[in-house]
Amino acid sequence: ERGKRVEERIEDVDKFWKTGMLNPASNVQFGEGGAGTFSDGKLNTLIHDAFGRGREVLKIFAEHGASRGILYESKPHIGTDVLMKVIKNMRQSLTEMGADIRFHSQVTDLSFSRDGERRRVSTLTVSDTMTGTSYLLPAETVVLAIGHSARDTFAMLKEQEVPMEPK
């Protein structure tokens, strides 16, 4: 996560709304929870979701502190204040299960090794968005949960010829 934790991020967003001063690494677009965190918590019911993914997301939100009403309301809504708590609770659940969530961290490059015909990621170059220093992080499996505003990351992946497909 190139931005800050949601509870730190709110300070940067409030400062922007009050003064117009933008923190490029922590704002409405960047930080834990992404752009949706400050969208006032309106949810899409995904009625036409044949695979039930939307329903599963709503259940996860409810399990982490959102009103259970979102599971049956025609226009589900969490609200920004509650959504920030839900996101914090989700982070806590993930870390309790062993997830390593690194804040102020931007993947700026990938290194690969060969496994026969296949390329496998072996190392990430990670830049600390607060200090500008970089470090190498060995990796066998990587989940890149990239928000829509991280165009620089998409450009790096394209340059590295990482297969991607549109949403």
Predicted segments with their positions:
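Residues forming the flavin
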Residues: 1-167
